[in-house]
Amino acid sequence: MTLRLQINGAPREFASRLTVQGLVAELGVAGKRIAIERNGEIVPRSQYGAVQLADGDKLEVVVAVGGG
């Protein structure tokens, strides 16, 4: 089964089902300060491992960058 997601406006395909936590690892942003919105709703960090992504989900992934 191919999982088709839209991430920051771009289509992406993954070979298997993913949780938000799995997606974070796939995108290489684990350990960074991030915010994830799924279909218009913010996903709390405490729920990353429990929220299963579905084919067609639209996600916005924002990585915080420090500066001054």
PLM features: residue spans?
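Ubiquitin-like/PB1-type beta-grasp interaction modules and other compact soluble beta-rich domains
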Residues: 1-67
